[in-house]
Amino acid sequence: MDLSALYYPYSHTLPAVYAQTHKLVAYNSIYNAFELYWLCVLPLLVLGVPLCLSCLPVRLSLPAKLGEKPLAASSRPEWDPTWVVPKHIAAIMDGNRRYGRTRYGLPLKGHQDGSQRVVDFMNWCVGAGVQILTVYAFSTENWGRAQAEVDALMNIFTSFMHDIIPQALERNIRVCVLVSDGAKFPSHIGSAIEKIETATAHCTAFTLNICASYGSRNEMVHTVQAIAAKVAAGTLAVDAIDEAVVSEHLLTKNVPDPDLLIRTSGECRLSNFLLYQIAYSELIFLDKMWPELNYDDFLHMMRTFNLRKRRFGK
C-alpha cells in the first residue's frame, strides 16, 4: 500500500505550521518586551533621573551666594568698569566675637582681626572709587557687656585710631568718630578721638566715619532736643522744620546718606544703626563673619548693588 498520499499533506503543512507558530512567538516576544519597557523601564527612568539629580550637592545647581567659601579662580568675579559705584557705604561689622571664639577660642582675638579688616575694606573702597565708609564699631547697647570685654574693646579702639593716622595722612583720608553718647567714654578715648579728627581734618580724598558709643535712637533724641531748643529760643520757626533741617542736626550732617548698607554674620536686622539715614539705602546681608570678608566678597557686593533698581519710591 502506498502511504505517501497519507503523509503528503502532513509533510508539507507541518513546516508551515511550525513557521507560522515561530512568527507568532516572535511577534509576541517583541510585544511583551515593548510592554515590559513601558510598564517597568520607563517609570524607572522617569523616577530615577530626579532621584539622581536630588543626590547632587546643592551648590552645584545653585549660584554661589555671598558668605560662602572663596570661589574657584575660574568663577571669581571681576571688576566691571560699567558698574555704578556707591558713593557712601555703611557697614555693620558683626560676628567678631563668634569668629574669635570659633577660630582661636578667644573672642577678643576676633575683634583684633576685625579691626584689621576695617583697613582692608577701606582700601577696597578707595580702590573702587567709593568716597565714604561708615562703620558701626561700638553701639550704646554694647556698654551692657562684661566690663572686662568693654575695657578690651576700648583698648583696641584706641590702638586702631593711633595706628591708622599715618596711613590716613599718606592717603589723604579723613577720619571722623560719630558719638551719640560720649558720657561713658574714658578721658583717654576722648583725647584719642580729638587727636585723629584734628590730624585728618584737612584730608579730602576719602572719609572714614567710625560710629562709637552710637545709637540711632539716641541720635534722634539729641536731634529733636537741639531743634526744640532753637524753636524755644525763637531762632527757628516750627513751620521751617523739614527733612533738611533734621538732617542738618544729625551726626552725619556733612555726608550724603548711604547708598549701600551691609551687615555680616548672617543676621538680618539694623540694630539701631543709621535708622534715619538709610531710608533708601540698598541692604545686603552676608553670611560671613566680618573678619572673614575678602576682596571677592567686596566684588559680589558691588555686582549685587548694580543689579538693584533704585527707584526711590518713584
Annotated model-derived regions:
Residues 2-314:
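Flexible, compositionally biased loop and terminal segments
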